Amino acid sequence: MREYLITLLISAALCYLITPIVRAQAIRFGAVAAIRDRDIHSVPTARWGGVAMWASMALTFAIVNHLPLVGKSFGHEAQGIFLASTAIVLLGMADDRFQLDALTKLAGQVFVAGILLIYGIQILWLPINGVITLPPSIGQLVTVLIVLVVINAVNFI
């Protein structure tokens, strides 16, 4: 249990320390949210907050990978999740900087979901009225759909 607490604290500290660096880089590269009538902020706001979170996750993985309990968690599936998160962060950075069109973003999101499927990560059952076990092909479609919905819900916020 102590290793998981250490992992949490390392990740939180790294994110706290990395955020100002990423913010400065976002401003430097022009990845800022312009002021609009519907927004609350009154000055341009730096984007790329996900980059700081991703960087803290990556550094935390590198630091705690050798701990006896936590290190055992980094298998094939964790590599897939890390690769997919890297791809979505890069897509988000490009979108924040260059305002990508909707079709390009959708293609990138489907690509990210495909990475998860390649690494064997998919929804196998749904807890609806008991448990519904899904055939692999339906599970893959549901996985892609849920990944797309979650990415766009987070991006909407």
Question: Language-model segments: what does each one mean?
Answer:
Residues 1-157:
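"…together with the soluble PPM/PP2C metallo-phosphatase catalytic core" -> "…together
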